[in-house]
Design a protein with these regions (language model features):
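Basic, amphipathic N-terminal segments that precede the first structured/catalytic domain
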Residues: 1, 163-170
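Generic hydrophobic alpha-helical segments
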Residues: 90-97, 155-158, 162-166
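A polyanion-binding, active-site-adjacent surface
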Residues: 1-120, 129-132, 139
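Short, flexible loop segments at boundaries between secondary-structure elements
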Residues: 49-51, 126-163
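Short, flexible coil/linker elements and helix-boundary hinge sites characteristic
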Residues: 125-126, 170
Length: 170
């Protein structure tokens, strides 16, 4: 069973790491709810078409989806929307994340905090997966992707980057 920070998927080969659960994740009980979840659905459709060896399904329940920080953060609850980098890189937190993604063949890190956590795990040898790094999939972050003028185009650019990174490590 999942939680606001983690959607486990026994047998999955690929996973996504985001920053932390927020109020929508807390109320719905699973990671990447609301706008981020809608963009993740768009990404999964595109990645499944482009690289089915790593993305065998467009369905989100076929992937591990987790966060670099497992605690819910949003201003009305915690007076902030993200953890500190020191919290994300803390030993206990990295051990938790390694347990969640350590057996995957491919990991896509979404957002700066996720990048830092996944790089730290790779540097320590805690994960041996192929790694890709992209912007967070919040609508605000997607709107900042250069090279396209609308959400579908920006999602395409994002997916191109992920595919290129994963294939480069072959």
């Amino acid at each position: 069973m999942g939680s606001p920070h983690l959607q486990p998927c026994p047998g999955a080969r690929t996973g996504f790491v985001f920053i932390c659960p927020g109020r929508f994740e807390a109320s719905r009980g699973y990671p990447c709810a609301a706008g981020t979840g809608a963009n993740l659905a768009r990404v999964l459709l595109a990645l499944h078409e482009r690289l089915p060896a790593f993305f065998p399904s467009p369905a989100r329940d076929k992937y591990v989806i987790t966060n670099s920080w497992d605690k819910v953060e949003y201003p009305a609850l915690t007076q902030r929307s993200v953890p500190t980098l020191d919290e994300v890189l803390g030993a206990a937190n990295l051990e938790r994340l390694a347990a969640e993604i350590g057996r995957l063949d491919a990991v896509v890190a979404c957002g700066a905090h996720a990048h830092a956590a996944v790089r730290a795990l790779a540097d320590r040898g805690s994960i041996q997966a192929r790694l890709a790094f992209g912007r967070h999939l919040s609508q605000r972050a997607v709107n900042m992707i250069p090279g396209a003028s609308d959400t579908p185009g920006r999602i395409g650019v994002w997916c191109d980057g992920v595919v290129a990174q994963l294939l480069q490590q072959g």
